[in-house]
Swiss-Prot record:
Pfam family, one: GidB
Species this protein is from: Histophilus somni (strain 2336)
Family: Belongs to the methyltransferase superfamily. RNA methyltransferase RsmG family.
Principal location: cytoplasm
Protein name: Ribosomal RNA small subunit methyltransferase G
EC number assigned by the record: 2.1.1.170
The protein's role, per its UniProt record: Specifically methylates the N7 position of guanine in position 527 of 16S rRNA.
UniProt catalytic activity: guanosine(527) in 16S rRNA + S-adenosyl-L-methionine = N(7)-methylguanosine(527) in 16S rRNA + S-adenosyl-L-homocysteine
Lineage: Bacteria, Pseudomonadati, Pseudomonadota, Gammaproteobacteria, Pasteurellales
Length: 212
């Protein structure tokens, strides 16, 4: 907890004591499961605080809307940390590997999270009965693949939230004409080596009246 408090001082985030306890508990659960199921290449719990917890929750101030889906979530990143500090928002966490979804289900039970829905599916095959205000991805795919594979999940007013390292103009150039970059935000992740960016993308709305 002391390490987490130290890291949080270098951000604008103000989680409650219960939320901080749950973030630490999530790290302990991930570390425990990782020994048996190899869920992440990060082995040190202190490193997990920086590379998985802080790297996820710094996105929180930029989320717009109430219902989100984290595609290719892996062991619930960034979805689980974001769900912990945003109890008023709903998060669907999608992955195609059973061991990852099993971990997420266990974490949801252990942490008593009521705003997380684990989904075992490939993103192209997932057909929900509603769309989402935001589609999140972290180390999932290129911007082009993310937008094309996930476009059926997003409302017309929603945003794609892509967590990236160094900003890559080639990825932007490869985007379909249906999508545009709305914002590129440089993220401050305390003690993380290397740059992190949040790329916000949206669908381009075509006014059919212009063609009549």
């Amino acid at each position: 907890m002391e390490k987490l408090n130290f890291l949080l001082k270098n951000t604008a985030l103000l989680p409650t004591n219960l939320q901080k306890e749950r973030l630490v508990q999530l790290v302990l659960l991930l570390n425990k499961w990782n020994k048996a199921y190899n869920l992440t290449s990060v082995r040190d719990p202190m490193e997990m605080l920086v590379k998985h917890i802080l790297d996820s929750i710094v996105v929180s101030p930029y989320l717009q809307g109430n219902i989100f889906i984290d595609v290719g979530t892996g062991p619930g990143l960034p979805g689980l940390p974001l769900a912990i500090i945003n109890p008023d928002k709903k998060f669907f966490l999608l992955d195609s590997l059973g061991k990852r979804i099993s971990f997420i289900r266990n974490a949801v039970r252990e942490l008593e999270l009521t705003n997380v829905e684990p989904v075992l599916s490939r993103v192209e095959e997932f057909k929900p009965d509603h769309q989402f205000d935001g589609v999140l991805s972290r180390a999932f795919a290129s911007l082009k693949d993310m937008t094309e594979w996930c476009q059926h999940l997003l409302t017309d007013q929603g945003f794609f939230y892509a967590l990236k390292g160094q900003y890559n103009m080639e990825e932007v150039s490869a985007l379909s004409a249906q999508f545009s970059v709305d914002k590129i935000i440089e993220l401050n992740v305390p003690e993380l080596v290397g740059k992190r960016h949040l790329v916000l993308l949206k669908k381009i709305r075509i006014n059919l009246m212009n063609y009549l």
